[in-house]
């Protein structure tokens, strides 16, 4: 069992990583006998895990209700958020309830925002079931829903009480979802840890084959890196923005193509190549390092070009609505070397458009 702490003073919390955590009620601390909880999941995961976790917690004396959401990025919306509030109010659940987010990034982000908002804030626990949510979205307290004009535009910073990562969940994860998560894994190597990137080059086959030892190390390392960044910059005023490598381009793809048509990790993968090409055009990133990124993404089964039907100019309106925009100026996360990156403003639009075009034609 691996345990990492996200250090935020009185709001610090553990990330527990192991196989078989869904068999032990202690995994879900600080829940205890007599507590009330609302388990939020989706229609894909409910048949796999809902009854098991509910029975486990009820055996431990926790009173558990549940709400089952439709599955897909297009349901990360205010309308679906309202169904969670309705379920909480119908019982009713008070301020002493705990929300349990059992699912991937959509369930985790939406449930976290519900917890931040319901009666001005209730406790919640992240139970991520996808690789992407285990290494990224469940850690750090970013919660949100989408708006038709932009991804994650309505949300709050709100930290969970704990994060429970059961490695067994990955055994039921579709290959496309596994690859999507690997995009965020590769991102950590590019922006923060060149040695980890090299490890990924050596161990990608093991990860794709769900080797338990490789997965445990990979998830632990990603969570360590994320925890360090969040502890230093919880509200994304500086360092934490580096975690958005590829996301400014990627969010444009998701919004333009319709949420759910490109998985988040797929869009981020293409976006990271666009960021690398931008950095190349600025003379601060080597072409051979871009090729290393492309090769690793392709080995993971990820796209390295944008959608053919999306022109370069279609990206800019979405990118100008990005949350990193300041005083009307686009700011991009750009790699400087494998393991080192920066946030840079003032990149000429023609450079950005050229980099996107490079990726469309690759």
UniProtKB/Swiss-Prot annotation:
HAMAP family: DHQ_synthase (MF_00110). It comes from Enterobacter sp. (strain 638). This is 3-dehydroquinate synthase. It comes from the Bacteria. Catalyzes the conversion of 3-deoxy-D-arabino-heptulosonate 7-phosphate (DAHP) to dehydroquinate (DHQ). Belongs to the sugar phosphate cyclases superfamily. Dehydroquinate synthase family. It is found in: Cytoplasm. It holds the Pfam family DHQ_synthase. GO terms for cellular component: cytoplasm. The keyword Cytoplasm applies. Binds 1 divalent metal cation per subunit. Can use either Co(2+) or Zn(2+). Keywords: Amino-acid biosynthesis, Aromatic amino acid biosynthesis, Cobalt, Cytoplasm, Lyase, Metal-binding, NAD, Nucleotide-binding, Zinc. InterPro entries: Dehydroquinate_synthase, DHQ_synth_AroB, DHQ_synth_fam, DHQS/DOIS_N, DHQS_C. One of its GO terms (biological process) is aromatic amino acid family biosynthetic process. NCBIfam families: aroB (TIGR01357).
């Amino acid at each position: 069992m691996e345990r990492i702490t996200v250090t935020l003073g009185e709001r610090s919390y553990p990330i527990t990583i192991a196989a078989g955590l869904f068999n032990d009620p202690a995994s879900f601390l600080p829940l205890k006998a007599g507590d009330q909880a609302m388990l939020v999941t989706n229609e894909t995961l409910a048949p796999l895990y809902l009854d098991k976790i509910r029975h486990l917690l009820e055996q431990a004396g926790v009173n558990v209700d549940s709400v089952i959401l439709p599955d897909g990025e297009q349901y990360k919306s205010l309308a679906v958020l309202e169904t969670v509030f309705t379920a909480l109010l119908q019982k009713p659940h008070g301020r002493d309830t705990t929300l349990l987010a059992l699912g991937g990034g959509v369930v985790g982000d939406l449930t976290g925002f519900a917890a931040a908002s319901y009666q001005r804030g209730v406790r919640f626990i992240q139970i991520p079931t996808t690789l992407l949510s285990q290494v990224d979205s469940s850690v750090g307290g970013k919660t949100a829903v989408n708006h038709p004009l932009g991804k994650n535009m309505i949300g709050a910073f709100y930290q969970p009480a704990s994060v429970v990562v059961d490695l067994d969940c990955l055994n039921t994860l579709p290959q496309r979802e596994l690859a999507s998560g690997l995009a965020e894994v590769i991102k950590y190597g590019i922006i923060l840890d060149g040695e980890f990137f090299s490890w990924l080059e050596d161990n990608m086959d093991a990860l794709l084959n769900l080797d338990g030892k490789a997965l445990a190390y990979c998830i632990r390392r990603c969570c360590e890196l994320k925890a360090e960044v969040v502890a230093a910059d919880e509200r994304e005023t500086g360092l934490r923005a580096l975690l958005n490598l590829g996301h400014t381009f990627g969010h444009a793809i998701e919004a333009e193509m319709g949420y759910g048509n490109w998985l988040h990790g797929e869009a981020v993968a293409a976006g990271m190549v666009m960021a690398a090409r931008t950095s190349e055009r600025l003379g601060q990133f080597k072409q051979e390092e871009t090729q290393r990124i492309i090769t690793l993404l392709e080995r993971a089964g990820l796209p390295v070009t944008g959608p053919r039907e999306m022109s370069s100019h279609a990206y800019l309106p979405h990118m100008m609505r990005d949350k990193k925009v300041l005083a009307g100026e686009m700011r991009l996360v750009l790699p400087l070397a494998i393991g080192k990156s920066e946030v840079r403003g003032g990149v000429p639009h023609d450079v950005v458009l050229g980099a996107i075009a490079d990726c469309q034609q690759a």
